[in-house]
């Protein structure tokens, strides 16, 4: 009889070895394919993170991209000024100079004619500049938490001469500061540290959330964005719910969701630059009445972080937290590098390769 293997048995062994090899290769390939889901409430900075990935990993914006963002910059700028003018009516703040009424009418007429994406005429630019330095407008800007105003309002309105120039072309920073509501799902692909990333940005407003569900399969990690600066603001959608309380509720539902028991969760406490300015004058007790700490960045941001981390009900799950400024490319590059290292370690462990 002997111990030689029959041709059939040899073929079966070869097949088995090949399957094992393929499984290992598949495992290594799976470890290289990274699916990231960007979640968070509306205006938490998700789309800005996507733009940063384009800058950091895809060579930035083309001149064609720059051109396409021009009307967005014009619209964001004039719409921000209009939001302030309308809020002055609601908050009963008069113009410092009555002559600004006619300037305000000119700006409102541009919106009414739906010409907000056009370059500013000389006349319009002069009116906007006069309005921007008006004491009433500046007073209303200081109360921006009482109405809905783009974070980038001051950034753009402080630079009207540059934006109004005939040869104006958006800079990288201008593009990062633009705001367009995300509807549907935006997908970005890039490679980094020998990994293939697919990043999905889904709309944060309540009406957009039902579109998330089919993105949930095979997610390697979730990046959950929170705007730290929104602790004293209410939602666009209902004007009564505190934005940070809404974020906490949403984080709770994501963090403890059955879909995500095996998924790494990375928390970006974003807009730290705005938070640092705001915390000096607007108390954290607006959102957290039980807070007794100082109105200082370190203590207040640590408290916010602790509130989010406390939502995690699983002792086996670690939340990886970073304080970020999504408009700062160096900061996001540094943070994303750290995030990738965590993903690599967790992923290899999950594939039994670490």
Curated annotation (Swiss-Prot):
A lipid is attached at residue 3 (S-palmitoyl cysteine). Signal peptide: none annotated. Pfam families: G-alpha. Residues 324-329 are annotated as: G5 motif. Residues 174-182 are annotated as: G2 motif. Residues 35-48 are annotated as: G1 motif. Mg(2+) binds at residues 47, 182. GO terms for molecular function: G protein-coupled receptor binding; G-protein beta/gamma-subunit complex binding; GTP binding; GTPase activity; metal ion binding. GTP binds at residues 40-47, 176-182, 201-205, 270-273, 326. InterPro entries: Gprotein_alpha_I, Gprotein_alpha_su, GproteinA_insert, P-loop_NTPase. Residues 32-354 form the G-alpha domain. Guanine nucleotide-binding proteins (G proteins) are involved as modulators or transducers in various transmembrane signaling systems. The G(o) protein function is not clear. This is Guanine nucleotide-binding protein G(o) subunit alpha.
